[in-house]
């Protein structure tokens, strides 16, 4: 009888321990939120879903990430602020709004900083880029990887731009940014801040003569219909950063941190491939529509670059060595 009671007690204890273990194991699962302001079929959003999928696979389902696309959780600035106090866990944002929180990122937005895309990726995928990712720590953020957003070019409705003097007097729509407004003014044009949604009608009615953006944006909002001159000056390449809240990051084990970083790099690789494909499709569509596409001769591009001296003095102050290092890559 005693043996039977002992056996029964042991069985109950074992069952209890097993159930407790199951509860603890179940409690370990983390459900996190990823904010993305672009549409579901956009390269950055597709990369976000890939990131979530990879993390879930490599953690055997312990970490599940829900992606909220289309700006459901707020605009980029609001999302960054929510990451800082842990209300949102992951995001991808342009370094333009991010530079409001980390001023050193302005360096990466300086006009005509890079010769081409290859140089930018040598910088961002190397030790310089790693330092910028790590610099987010003091803002309660952790930088994970770099996404592509292409090169921004000028376009207008008046004339093809082949030399610096062609910029003179053009009313160019810009984002409400001191750097962007200063850049346009330094090139001899008139900087006109305007809401993005008003640009098409502004071009159509002549309130503005031109604007600036990358191939997919020029195509997707049909600005090529009312501003048919597009110059490949590539004045800025503004990369985007994939981030995690430091409050969330500190909850991960070292092995999970390694997984998160690995998945971030893989998703960034996918985003860059998708972006390149999207650029190609947009360029083909714009060219087929009969737009005039021009490029700057090397000597002329040097004049555009030289005109940026005031911008470098203002926004690069204190970071001269970093800028020289970037340009030497």
Annotate each PLM feature.
Residues 10, 22-119, 128, 136-329:
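N-terminal secretory/targeting leader peptides
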Residues 16-19:
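Bacterial Sec-type N-terminal signal peptides, specifically the leucine/valine-rich hydrophobic h-region
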Residues 133:
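Thiol/selenol-based redox catalytic cores and closely related redox-interacting motifs
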Residues 1-9:
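Bacterial N-terminal signal peptides that target proteins for export
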């Amino acid at each position: 009888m005693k043996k039977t009671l002992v056996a029964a007690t042991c069985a109950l204890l074992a069952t209890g321990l097993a159930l407790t273990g199951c509860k603890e194991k179940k409690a370990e699962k983390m459900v996190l939120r990823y904010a993305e302001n672009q549409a579901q079929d956009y390269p950055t959003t597709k990369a976000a879903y890939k990131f979530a999928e990879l993390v879930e696979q490599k953690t055997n389902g312990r970490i599940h990430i829900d992606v909220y696309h289309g700006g459901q959780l707020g605009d980029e600035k609001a999302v960054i602020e929510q990451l800082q106090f842990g209300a949102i866990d992951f995001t991808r944002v342009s370094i333009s709004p991010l530079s409001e929180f980390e001023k050193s990122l302005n360096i990466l937005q300086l006009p005509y900083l890079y010769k081409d895309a290859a140089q930018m990726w040598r910088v961002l995928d190397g030790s310089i880029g790693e330092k910028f990712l790590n610099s987010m720590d003091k803002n309660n953020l952790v930088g994970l990887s770099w996404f592509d957003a292409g090169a921004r070019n000028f376009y207008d409705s008046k004339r093809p731009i082949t030399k610096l003097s062609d910029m003179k007097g053009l009313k160019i729509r810009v984002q409400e940014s001191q750097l962007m407004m200063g850049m346009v003014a330094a090139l001899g044009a008139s900087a006109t801040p305007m809401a993005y949604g008003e640009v098409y009608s502004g071009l159509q009615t002549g309130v503005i003569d031109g604007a600036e953006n990358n191939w997919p944006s020029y195509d997707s909002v049909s600005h090529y219909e009312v501003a048919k001159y597009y110059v490949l000056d590539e004045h800025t390449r503004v990369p985007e950063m994939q981030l995690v809240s430091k409050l969330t990051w500190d909850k991960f084990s070292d092995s999970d941190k390694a997984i998160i970083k690995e998945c971030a790099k893989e998703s960034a690789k996918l985003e860059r491939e998708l972006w390149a494909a999207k650029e190609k499709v947009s360029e083909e569509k714009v060219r087929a529509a009969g737009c005039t596409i021009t490029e700057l001769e090397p000597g002329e591009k040097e004049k555009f670059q030289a005109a940026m001296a005031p911008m470098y003095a203002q926004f690069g102050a204190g970071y001269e060595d970093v800028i020289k290092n970037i340009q030497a890559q």
